[in-house]
């Protein structure tokens, strides 16, 4: 009788590229494929260790001379909205949330293009066509939802929906983990910047996680010194994954992107410390 043993994930490293967050620095990522029956379990385990999902790949920054990127998550039970965040929630309370399967639509792509053209015209995703967008949404081997936010005609709101229809104003691609919700990618109507829809998406996911009994909302990476990431530090009960452990962020100003050369471990040691699901060892 022949038995097939489970294969442990293989980890690889990308070639250095210009960092999108800190000028003059190089970015390098440690990554592994995400596939098969154990994909959800692997996604759960590695998300707790600072990894993020992009389609069928899990990755974590592993730069040669920088450890500035730190995974961030909100402790749902301890979160208290600020006065500004409460005002944002009230202003967007009329929006209808719709959770759908991971299926891309032309309407979503049009909103995505408007968002990129206005907010990230020089970014790495700026040239994505509709087929690449569909791959970003649909190529997922794990439990994923597309969360849409819509304003309806007749709503008592300042967001005017188009005649005879409702208006798609924001979208979030969300993974459902065993301990929380992970915001993979979100975008919104750039013409409605005054409504702080990015913040509203996070606040709504905190409510979603609380109602589902999930303890965390994963926000991706926080980078001290990066203005693009400043908004994440404005949420209370925020934890960062630093030095191999989750810890309260404390005063964001105390964190720096400057490091000692000996504080970065070789790739082999980093991989050896990754805790894999028990059936994948």
UniProtKB/Swiss-Prot annotation:
Keyword Ion transport: no
Alphabetized UniProt keyword annotations: Acyltransferase, Cytoplasm, Transferase
Molecular function GO labels: arginyl-tRNA--protein transferase activity; leucyl-tRNA--protein transferase activity
Any one of the GO CC terms: cytoplasm
Compartments where located: Cytoplasm
Swiss-Prot/TrEMBL catalytic activity: N-terminal L-glutamyl-[protein] + L-leucyl-tRNA(Leu) = N-terminal L-leucyl-L-glutamyl-[protein] + tRNA(Leu) + H(+); N-terminal L-aspartyl-[protein] + L-leucyl-tRNA(Leu) = N-terminal L-leucyl-L-aspartyl-[protein] + tRNA(Leu) + H(+)
UniProt main location, coarse: cytoplasm
Enzyme class: transferase
Family: Belongs to the R-transferase family. Bpt subfamily.
Protein name per Swiss-Prot or TrEMBL: Aspartate/glutamate leucyltransferase
Gene name of the record: bpt
């Amino acid at each position: 009788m022949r038995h097939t043993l489970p294969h442990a994930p293989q980890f690889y490293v990308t070639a250095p590229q210009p960092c999108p967050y800190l000028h003059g620095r190089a970015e390098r990522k440690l990554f592994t494929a995400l596939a098969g029956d154990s994909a959800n379990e692997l996604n759960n385990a590695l998300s707790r260790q600072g990894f993020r999902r992009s389609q069928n790949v899990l990755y974590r920054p592993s730069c040669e001379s920088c450890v500035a990127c730190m995974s961030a998550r909100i402790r749902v039970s301890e979160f208290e909205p600020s006065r500004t965040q409460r005002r944002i929630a009230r202003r967007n309370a009329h929006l209808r949330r719709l959770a759908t399967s991971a299926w891309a639509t032309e309407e979503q792509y049009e909103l995505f293009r408007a968002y990129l053209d206005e907010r990230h015209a020089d970014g790495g995703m700026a040239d994505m066509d509709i087929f690449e967008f569909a791959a970003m949404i649909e190529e997922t081997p794990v439990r994923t939802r597309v969360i849409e936010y819509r304003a309806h005609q007749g709503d008592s709101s300042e967001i005017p929906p188009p005649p005879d229809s409702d208006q798609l104003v924001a979208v979030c691609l969300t993974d459902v983990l065993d301990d929380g919700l992970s915001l993979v990618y979100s975008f919104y109507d750039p013409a409605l910047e005054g409504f702080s829809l990015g913040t509203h998406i996070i606040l709504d996911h905190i409510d979603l996680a609380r109602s589902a009994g999930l303890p965390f909302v994963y926000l991706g990476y926080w980078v001290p010194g990066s203005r693009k990431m400043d908004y994440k530090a404005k949420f209370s009960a925020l934890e960062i994954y630093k030095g191999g452990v989750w810890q309260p962020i404390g005063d964001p100003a105390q964190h720096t992107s400057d490091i000692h050369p000996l504080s970065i471990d070789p790739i082999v040691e980093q991989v050896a410390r990754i805790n894999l699901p028990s059936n994948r060892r």
